[in-house]
Regions:
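Short, well-structured N-terminal submotif of metal-dependent ribonuclease cores
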Residues: 1-42, 57-63, 70, 137
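Acidic, PIN/NYN-like endoribonuclease modules and their adjacent C-terminal/linker elements
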Residues: 1-3, 106-137
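Structured helix-beta-strand junction loops
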Residues: 35-37, 75, 96
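General small-molecule cofactor/ligand-binding pocket signal
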Residues: 41, 79-81, 134
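Short, conserved alpha-helical segments within structured domains
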Residues: 42-46, 85
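Active-site neighborhoods of divalent-metal-dependent phosphate/nucleic-acid chemistry enzymes
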Residues: 77-120
């Protein structure tokens, strides 16, 4: 089966529908994926860029970003590396009110049973249950 990587810009057009004619391109690809004609692929960097753009440029609130991006990540129309890590990161991003990339790092760490982090960013990481910040002094 043909695999097709989907870039951030197509997801953004689809999620915001600010350019409906471009949003339709991803709708068409999803339909083709659902029919088994191709397999759509995306990675964690694409979703980090989606979250950042929705938050910074489109000014979407975290709960809306969590809701709409989680729906895409959970969709079987896409082959997404680290799907479980992304879903946890989206939940923590919203529920713990932390930066998405920090939530992703914490989720990635927890998946690998790492519970200590050396960081200067105590603000976000202290909010994550089960993680401890290493004393750097």
């Amino acid at each position: 089966m043909n695999k097709v990587f989907v870039d951030t810009n197509l997801f953004l057009r689809y999620l915001t529908n600010d350019l409906p004619e471009q949003a339709a391109h991803l709708e068409n690809l999803i339909e083709r994926s659902n029919r088994g004609e191709l397999r759509l692929v995306a990675n964690s960097m694409v979703f980090a860029e989606i979250v950042w753009t929705l938050q910074s440029f489109y000014q979407y609130p975290k709960d809306k970003i969590d809701e709409i991006v989680s729906a895409i990540v959970a969709s079987e129309a896409f082959e997404i590396e680290e799907r479980d890590i992304l879903l946890q990161a989206l939940e923590d991003f919203h529920s713990l009110n932390i930066d998405f990339v920090d939530a992703y790092i914490a989720s990635w760490m927890q998946k690998r049973r790492l519970d200590k982090i050396a960081t200067l960013n105590k603000k976000d990481f202290k909010r994550i249950p089960g993680l401890s910040i290493v004393n750097l002094e």
